[in-house]
Amino acid sequence: MLAPNYLDHAPDRLILLWQQAEDDILRDVARRIGKMDSLTPTANWQLWRYQQTEAVRKDVVKLLARYTGKSEAEIRRLMKEAATAALEAEDEIYYHYGKEPTPFEESTPLQNLLNAGYRQTAGSFSNLTATTANTVSGAFEQALDRAWLQVSSGAFDYKTAVKRAVDGLADSMPYVTYPSGHRDTLEVACRRAVLTGVNQTGAKLQEARMDEMGASFVEVTAHGGARPSHAVWQGRRYHRGGAVDYLGQHYEDFESATGYGTGAGLCGWNCRHTFFVVFPELGSPPAWTQESLEALNARDIEYDGRLYTRYEISQMQRARERAVRKWKRRYLAEDAAGADTTASAMKLRQARQSLADFTRATGGRVDSARTSVHGFGRSEASRAAWDVRHNTLTNAAGQTIIKVGKSDIKGPRNGITQKTNAKGGIDRNYYGADGRQTKQISNNGHGHKVEEALGKHGEHAHDYIFDATGRLIGRPSRELTDAERKENSDIL
């Protein structure tokens, strides 16, 4: 038997390995995209694009060769460790009831099952990584095409197009393609393949042990936050080989009740449940009662005025940890491409603060392994902090503002930028969730008659209006609201 918490963390070392591979690939791709600004409109775009795409494909193949050997060795180590842990826990039950199972190391059938599980798990993941070179180069090619179209159409300058392309790949570049056509990251594919392989191999070993010992009753483990289709059968007892009534108790059929043996059922895709042998005739008490199952999802942790289950709190923390990784990856990718890293540095600081505040409020602990990004060390952290200190400021409302050299109708999502205008005044640009500018606050009238007539000293606002295609169709000027005056009192 493998505990849900063991299964949750079993792939961690392997995931860290493939996260490093992802980060290496991303920086290489970003560096190549950054070379776009060296091209002229008359350059042979198609030839350059082909050369860069082929170079990415070859680089990915070389990098995968470096990681594959380490990956296979770690899968073998993990499978052996997990199998040993599963059978040690199971055999303790047999010993407790006076039974003598064959030692795992001396059992040829069990060793054969372990080796078969390793080959299947390593093989399935190897099949996925075999698609990585084409998946990554395809995503790179599409990003290049979008960036080139934005530049050649005049929609964006080189720097903006490069930054948008790099940020998009940092956030969502796929690395593997499943036979169904679904694409995913190496991290997600690794967790799914290894967690499923480890759990299924452990389950097959336990089944073989039960056959050896003539046992037929099992109890399924339970954990908080189980998906609804799994919550109905977790923590209960079943009979292998069909439903039975035994010693005044009804036992449902193990496979039909839990879906064991199917991808969507017990020990299936990403499932952290497993089972262990029980002997009702020998008086073995159930590990789970209805009360203890209900307690798994008790809302007993308070955060921000509401009560949450432990599972919900853990997922909220995971989301904040992913945000830290996201902005580290963006920072490194932008840095490799030679793009402006200020916005990412600022978002990283905010994400780190959000995670620290959350764990402090909920009594949790920051897991540095879940926020680490290969290549983002002390030096990068120091540079990111410098970016924030020297390229941002705070307004009267406590909002962080990015200092820029020029205004643009596209900017940081839900962000604010500031520049000095031609008349020596200050313009603050506000952006919505889609990165489009929503308004501009200026502390002077730019020397324009309409704006100079507004406010006390020409201070005014422009609202930005776009049509359905995203084209700017108007920026009417108006008086500042009381709230806007208060928020921007530091420049008025």
Regions found by a protein language model. Name each.
Residues 126-213:
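Contiguous, non-catalytic segments that form substrate-binding/exosite surfaces or channel walls
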Residues 184-291:
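Acidic, glycine-rich two-metal-ion catalytic cores of nucleic acid-processing enzymes
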